[in-house]
Structure formats: structure tokens, C-alpha cells
Amino acid sequence: MTNYIAALVDELYQLGVREAVISPGSRSTPLSVLFCEYGFQVYVGIDERSAGFFALGIAKEKERPVVLVCSSGSAVAHYFPAIVEAKHSHVPLIVLTADRPPELRQVGAPQTIDQIKFYHDYAKYFEELALPEEREGMYRYVRGVMRKAYVSSLDQGYGVAHINIPLREPLSPDLDGVDFTAGRLDYPFAWKTGEKGLTMDSSVFQDKKGIIICGGDPYADYHREVLELAERLKAPLLADPLANFRNDDHPLIMDCYDAFLKSDAVKVELKPEFIIHFGQTPVSKRLQNFTAMHQDVLYFQVNDYFQYRDPSLSISRYLVASPKAFARSVKVHNTDDGYSGRWQHYQARMRRRLNLAQDEEELFEGKLVQKLQDSLPEGSRLFVANSMAIRDVDYFLEARRQRIKVLGNRGANGIDGTVSTALGVATSGHPTVLLTGDLAFFHDLNGLLIGKNHGLNLIIVLLNNNGGAIFKYLPQSENKYFELLFMTPHGMDFSGLKTLYDLTYYEPVDYESFAQNFQEALTLSGVKVLNVKIDARLSKELHDRLTNLD
């Protein structure tokens, strides 16, 4: 527990917090002791109500967040009047409430109340910490929560961030073994907004090896500026399929990094010195693992507004600024293209490997994505379901000069609402195609009624592997209940949809009939379903073979 809480305390200090107002209590012992041990300016207020307003006064005068610390139970409630005032007078406070661990809640344990979102909308931000664990990943995690709390107390109007902290006994920290540096990044986290984000010292990119990550962003208007930035920095641009940078064949655009980053040796060889990240979290889990592997790298996230997207717990600079304006503001011109050349080498090798899918005769998702890309009219919308469909697009959708827009629901990454969302996209009047697996399709079958009732035009390419084949790629595949709980074969006959929803239905049996059906579907009105049956076992074998560098 000691170093977990020590990392929390240190991160707040690194962010610029200097004052802690502490209300005495037992459950908050590790927090109180370690704030004192670190050297914060500590004030003790016996009455929590008074302590809350005292902290409010400090924050008003200092114009920076002040920490409030209390024990569990009714102590939490006594801060409420000050928190109400902080909300309405826009004063930054970070409230740390100690709590009983889960096993002592709802069982009559003393000084235990429901502290989850206790301050309701009076707090701008709430999060409950995980129980303390003494390991590196958890130290980085707790630091990340403090960053979110700190920025939330300042961003878009000052206010209150509330962090609830469950703690188990023993509660006294080990002051002899405490390490306040646990989980620190090599570059302390910094948050800049507006003009400050555009006046940063861009010499940090001079003669450095770096990459640009472009995650999904349906509203992106910065493609040209970011490509020009990549050219100036000689930085490979890792283009998530939903970022829509793959509408260009620029040699710096990487479109199959998820495959070659499977290799640990390649991940080590391609270590960057900086990362610039635009847009959402990428689809590629291997890319997230790559950034997590290189914690000592200067990692910038650039966004129009603050939304902490950092599953790899690696970000060291958050710039709230227009991506377009930021890209223009970096005037550095690097000359050495050796680093980007190594990325291009693996990109070319992997793309040749993935394109071997064209030689396959059996129906396979990878080749179907390639055929689909060849067949989409200019200006098309390709809506891609989650689970395996988006991963197949990530692998097999090649960067080339074309004009299509790829969309998906990567906010919560669920499979629900897939058909309905695609139909909403289809109201644009652009040719619209939904690429989906069978479970995502089944999950939202009733969405087809909207298409029928409103006469919408949508082509649905249904990759039907009879269940949750994505789990074949995960550790659950070894479980003895795999078929029952994860693969969930359904054996459904979707042909009845033709009558039920008055749609056009196809069951292509090979690539020739798929191409014919697809071209015909482009000429027809209404909803058209191409049910392509896939052998899940063969598909897994082909994925494994084609996504290996060797």
C-alpha cells in the first residue's frame, strides 16, 4: 500500500499542488502521513465543514487546486457545503475521501456509508481508485487518475474532483521503505491548453526519431496538415482505419503495423524518442502494447478538448489545441529518414504478406475486405462493426488514393446498435456499406425495420462464421467451456429476413458470386444483405499465417 499512495502524493506535487488540508481520521492514515512525509504544506482542520471552507479560501487565493483529505463515513458529508460553494464559485479542489474496502460495505461496518459519487453533480469528476497493489502498473495507474483529477478541477471552468480511495488494514505506511518516485515517467506529465499548447518548444522534435499515431476521428479536418508534419519530422504516420488517412498512398502512412508489431524484436528495434497522438485510442492492441513498452518516451496527445485516452498509461504531455493548428505550429525540419525507413521496410514486407490473401480460393475475411475496397464507389461510407470486422479492416484495408469514409462505433467498442447506426449513416445519400460479423448483426436485427420503413439504401456484407470467432484469438479459446460460453454457435438461417423486412438477400458461395452480388446490390434500392459464410477454423489458420513476418 505504501508506494501506491506515495505515487498518488508525488504525482499531485509534480502537477503543481502544494497544499493539503487534512481532517483527522483512522481510515485516511496513509494519505495523511504521506502528505506530511513528502513535504506538502499541511493544514489540519478538526471540523470537516470548517476544513472544507478553509481549503476553499486557500484555492481562491493561490488560484490552484488544493487537496482535501478525510476519513470514511459522515466525515465525507461534512465537506458538502464547501463543495457546493466551490462548484458555484468555480474554485479548484481535489477531494480525497478514504473508504472501507468492498468487503466491509453494506454489512454494518462502522463509519461506512455509500461514498460513490457522493457529491453528485457538484463534483466535475469522480473516480474510485482500485485497492492498492504494489506493482509498477498500479503506480502508473494511480498517477493517471491524479492527472485526470487535477486537469478536471481546472479545465473548462474550475471546480471539484472527487476521488474515493478504499483502503484495507493495516493502515500505517512504511516510512522506512517509502519510494515516492514509484511509477514516475521519465517526462513529468504536463497539460497545456489553448495558445500555451501552440507555443511549446518544438525543438524537442529536432533530430529525434518519432511516430505520429492517428486514431479514429469522424470529424477530422487536419489530414493535410498532419501529413505535412509527418514529412517535416520524417515520422511514420500510423493510420487507424477510422482515422481515414488511408485515402492516400503517401510512403509515410503505415497501414499494417498491427501485424508486424506482433514481433517483440521489431517492437524493440522501432523504439521512438517521441510520439504524437491525434484522435481516439487506436483499434490495434499491439500498438497500445508498443507504447506501453516504451514508457520513457515523450508522448504527446493533442485534442480539441480534454479527454484522457491513455490505456497504455504512457502519456506525458496533453495539449488541448486544434490538431490542425498544432501541426502547423511545429516548424522543425528533420533530415535523417533512417528511422522512418525501418518502419517502411516492415510495412512493405507485411503488406506483401497480407496481399497473399488474394491467392486464397476459400472465402476469407481478409480477401473479402480487399475485394470490398476494390469495389466501393468514390464517396462511399464503409461502416465497420466491432469485434473481428474492424480488426480485419485494420489488417487488410490498404492505404491508397481513393475517396471513401470509414466509420465505426469505437466509443464504448460494443457490438450493439451496429445495423441502426449504419442506417443512420445511410441517410446521407452516399453509397453506404456495413461490414459486420454475425453476432453484431443478430444483436441489432430489429434495426432493419427503420431501413424498411424509411426506404433507406444500405448494403450489408455479413461475415458469418457462426458465432464469436474472435475468441479463438484470445486465451479463452483454451477453456473447456469455449464452445458454450464464447464461440456460441447459433446455426441461424438469415434467409427469412427477405420476407420479414422486405429486403434483398444473397448467399454468395465464392468470390465470383460475391462480386456479382455486390455490383448488383449497388444498383438496387433498399437494404441488401450479402450473407458470406466463413469457416472459422480455416479463417484462424489464414490469419495466423498471413499476419506473421516469417
UniProtKB/Swiss-Prot annotation:
Belongs to the TPP enzyme family. MenD subfamily. HAMAP family: MenD. Its EC number is 2.2.1.9. InterPro entries: DHS-like_NAD/FAD-binding_dom, MenaQ_synth_MenD, MenD_middle, THDP-binding, Thiamin_PyroP_enz_TPP-bd_dom, TPP_enzyme_TPP-bd. One of its GO terms (biological process) is menaquinone biosynthetic process. Binds 1 thiamine pyrophosphate per subunit. The keyword Ribosomal protein does not apply. It comes from Desulfitobacterium hafniense (strain Y51). It is an enzyme of class 2 (transferase). One of its GO terms (molecular function) is manganese ion binding. Pathway: Quinol/quinone metabolism; 1,4-dihydroxy-2-naphthoate biosynthesis; 1,4-dihydroxy-2-naphthoate from chorismate: step 2/7; Quinol/quinone metabolism; menaquinone biosynthesis. The gene is menD. It holds the Pfam family TPP_enzyme_C. This is 2-succinyl-5-enolpyruvyl-6-hydroxy-3-cyclohexene-1-carboxylate synthase. The lineage of its organism: Bacteria, Bacillati, Bacillota, Clostridia, Eubacteriales. Its cofactor is Mg(2+); Mn(2+); thiamine diphosphate.
